[in-house]
Amino acid sequence: LVGSEMCIRDSCYTYQGQQGKEQFDLEPEDEVFLCNWAKENYGTEFIFVTNFPSSKPPFYAMNDKEDPRTACKFDLLFRGLEITTGGQRIHDYNEQLEKMKAQGLDPEDFKSYLESHKYGLPPHGGLGIGLERLVMKLLGQANVRQASMFPRDMNRLLP
């Protein structure tokens, strides 16, 4: 399966006529809309959403060097649901320190994390995939509990 990619600025806010929105974020109905749009226009059930505002992702997400207003972050949507999120991480000590301060975080609270930056980190990234979410969508289930061997919720903490 081939996926398509869309900058978040051009995503559902453009296609649903909400171009003037200041805050770029995806609601569940936006994710469904984007996946339907990708399927209709590109014949794929996967779509990558990129270029999130740099103020939204976590403090460790690297800003895009060409457009510092955006972060090097992505979400992968499949059949109307985010199944993966990831991006490039900051590996420069001073850049990490600046971003923490810009987000109102106290660097003292992250002393051991920052130590690794002082000694040199290679460029790196990461991602997280919701395997149970993916299985739920592949099997056409309505709830993630139906795709989990030992589902957890407010009333069930043990198998």
Show which residues each predicted segment covers.
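Metal-assisted phosphate- and nucleotidyl-transfer catalytic regions
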Residues: 4, 9-79, 102-115, 119-121
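Short loop/turn segments at secondary-structure transitions that flank enzyme active sites
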Residues: 55, 82, 153
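Active-site pocket scaffolds in enzymes
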Residues: 87-88, 93-159
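Structured core elements
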Residues: 48, 73-77, 82-84, 128, ...
